[in-house]
Amino acid sequence: MRLLHISDWHLGRVTYTCPRSPDHDRVIREITDIARDFRPHLICHTGDVFDSLRPSYPDLIRGVDALQALAAIAPVLVVCGNHDSPALFRLFATLLGKRSRLHFIDSARPPEIGGVLEFPGAKAEIIRIAPLPFVHGNRFVDAFEDSSTWMATYADRIQRIEDALGRGLTDGFDPSRHILIFAAHLHVTGAVFSGSERALHVTDTYASRLERIPQVSYAAFGHIHRPQPLPGSVTGWYAGSPIPLDFGERDEKKLVVAVEAEPSRPALIKTHELSGGRPLRRLAGTLEELQSLAPTVGDALCVVTARTKQPMSDLDDRIRELFPAATLLNVSEDCAARQLSVLGARDAPSESEPSFSEMFREYLAAEGTRGAEADSVLRTFDSLIRCVEQENEPLFPEMAALQRTLEESLP
């Protein structure tokens, strides 16, 4: 039996203000090519097809078209993730019908009413798979829970569901034919995060117990974006996201998991690396230092910090010239002229309160300025303070020049 495990596409993701659809299109083509070469008997997507509960129309089309293309290669089982909409998955399942090779699982079900599914494997093999979509901590799964579980911990609730699905997998189990698979969108204790996961749903409150996973040939997990084997001795993987969804994932190798298993024998696991779409880069340095990096940047999505001596009004244009093929997510300037040194204790009288100018200098040293040179801003501030103290009207050369221009322009 051959199974291809994919997960956490997050179609519709935007990084800064940049849609990631070109990157998704690239890796989905790669995944489809891998599936054609591998020729699996089943493709399992362990959740978060979409990045939001209400995906846009283009993202809906992108997701359904991609899954339909995979379903032309092998049956596809899609488990609902915490970013997916169970209602949308139910709609998909209704529209596709029971004869479709594309199966959307919106919620956990008891084994006796569809909680364990079977698919043909090689020769006389039968793949038995128990899917467990994401379970929200504040919602009850009616088929598994009642008032006695209201005060149970999240881990206890998940354990109750896993135990029931485990019993369903082994009911009538034939070790010469059946290959057991568990597919879930869950956080298990010991998994390593990327940092881009929805923070609430990867806290200890949402941690489930690894040791209570049903005994299976392979456990396919989604929810954690860093590809990794399951911790401990369980044979299984988090397939992870196919592209780096934010800068916390920029150094991760993205992949899909290919599984080969036979009845009563350990599964063989091989990973296939993906390009990950356009890389994410953080670049910092002087213009000369940034120029030296240009050959390595290519079409990356970049956050750039340029260190300059004086403010540069054309900085964005200069950076675009350095990286013409890159997408600039953000360009910021670290300008020496906008920074002031912080006054120390030796710079002030030992028993005096700091003056307004001293406090403003300290502020500028920490925050800098948006455009003007810091020394010029400080001189203007000092002039204003003196005018207030002497009860004089502030008068600056720039204001006088503007006043003369206005007077000369009047008839």
Where are these regions (language model features)?
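Short coil/turn segments at beta-strand junctions that form active-site/ligand-binding loops
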Residues: 1, 39-41, 74, 125, ...
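Divalent metal-coordination and catalytic microenvironments
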Residues: 8, 28, 43, 48, ...
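N-terminal active-site segment of His-dependent metallophosphoesterases
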Residues: 1-72, 383, 387, 410
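His/Asp/Glu-rich metal-coordinating catalytic cores
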Residues: 55, 64, 69, 77-234
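Accessory, non-catalytic peripheral segments of nucleic-acid enzymes
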Residues: 260-411
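Active-site glycine- and acidic-residue-rich loops that bind
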Residues: 155-161, 248-250, 309
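Binuclear metal-dependent phosphoesterase catalytic core
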Residues: 113-127, 132, 236-301
